[in-house]
Amino acid sequence: SRQHKRSGRESLDCALMLQELTDMGVENIITFDAHDPRVHNAIPLKGFESVSCTYQFIKYLLLGVDDLHIDSQHMMVISPDEGGMGRAVYFANVLGLDMGMFYKRRDYTKIINGRNPIVAHEFLGSNVEGKDVIIIDDMISSGESMIDVASELKKRGASRVFCATTFGLFTNGFKKFDEAYENGVIDKILTTNLIYQPEELLSKPWY
């Protein structure tokens, strides 16, 4: 579940789900790239492990991209928001790279589709000009934030943009990603096969 924190009088659905599983006799839970691993505090006396997919992403980059230079002069790891900092820090440490992050500036006077709309993506980090960048996140939902972040990096002079995410949902289809690829905003999107991958997705040149 993505709902790892409460807003107002909402229920904490992820915690409730974990507690119901343990009430049915489950002793240990293994998941992949939990949206927030701290949710295991809902079942402190049971086993809970969140498996990172960092190795799979690094393996593809090393085997699938020939002219990649993995050093801090040529590459940088980017977190698309403050919630994914831990994931990006780990990825950057494994590869020995610098890290940057974006934070979402929202308009809290409005609610659109149940959320406060994002006004701008503000960047915190060193210069990305001329560097390949890896945007690391746990999921692509509609993909709007990922494309916005990639666009901001391109405006700042980034060379190639690779998006690595554990779960590729693509809830609004692939059109925006096709356009982003054609316009040179993104070069490659990496996901795992932990959820269903339609044939249309597998045939995309950017996937």
Q: What is the predicted function of each stretch?
A:
Residues 1-207:
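PRPP-associated nucleotide enzymes
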